Amino acid sequence: MHELSMADAIVRTVIDAAEKNDAVEVLEVTVEIGQLTLLNPEQIEFMLDVLSEGTILEGARFNLEVVPVEIECECGYEGVVEADELDHFAPVIKCPACGGHEFHVRAGRECNVKNIKIEKKD
């Protein structure tokens, strides 16, 4: 279950950023999760809530944005690979235009803290 370790890393990252910016409270956190990470957003959100207890993050709203897989194929196709075309147990993807596997993945592998909204000291 790599969701736990990823949620822990997110919590540590947000706490570190909040402390560096003299926050008294974290109000909202937006996280981007790429489809190819195979992370379950519902599990991540649950673990973020649990790991936030007793910290500056407790009570914060977590917004999880799923980033679709975008490819650039040798055939010239540039765009999104639809989620229903992905096998979530083994993320083998192919170009929807030519069926090929020779492409560059432009998006969908990331897991980033995109935005943190804090309450600062007066």
Curated annotation (Swiss-Prot):
Cite the Pfam families for this sequence. HypA
GO BP field: protein maturation; protein modification process
Q: Where does Zn(2+) bind?
A: C73, C75, C95, C98
Q: Which UniProt keywords apply?
A: Metal-binding, Nickel, Zinc
* Superkingdom in the source lineage: Archaea
Q: Which GO terms describe its molecular function?
A: nickel cation binding; zinc ion binding
Record-annotated residues binding Ni(2+)?
Answer: H2
Cited PROSITE patterns: HYPA
* Disulfide partners: none
Q: What does this protein do?
A: Involved in the maturation of [NiFe] hydrogenases. Required for nickel insertion into the metal center of the hydrogenase.
- List the PANTHER family hit by this protein, alphabetically: HYDROGENASE MATURATION FACTOR HYPA
The cross-references to HAMAP family, in alphabetical order and at most eight, read:
HypA_HybF
* Similarity-based family: Belongs to the HypA/HybF family.
Q: Spell out the protein name for this chain.
A: Hydrogenase maturation factor HypA
Organism expressing this protein natively = Methanothermobacter thermautotrophicus (strain ATCC 29096 / DSM 1053 / JCM 10044 / NBRC 100330 / Delta H)
Name of the coding gene: hypA
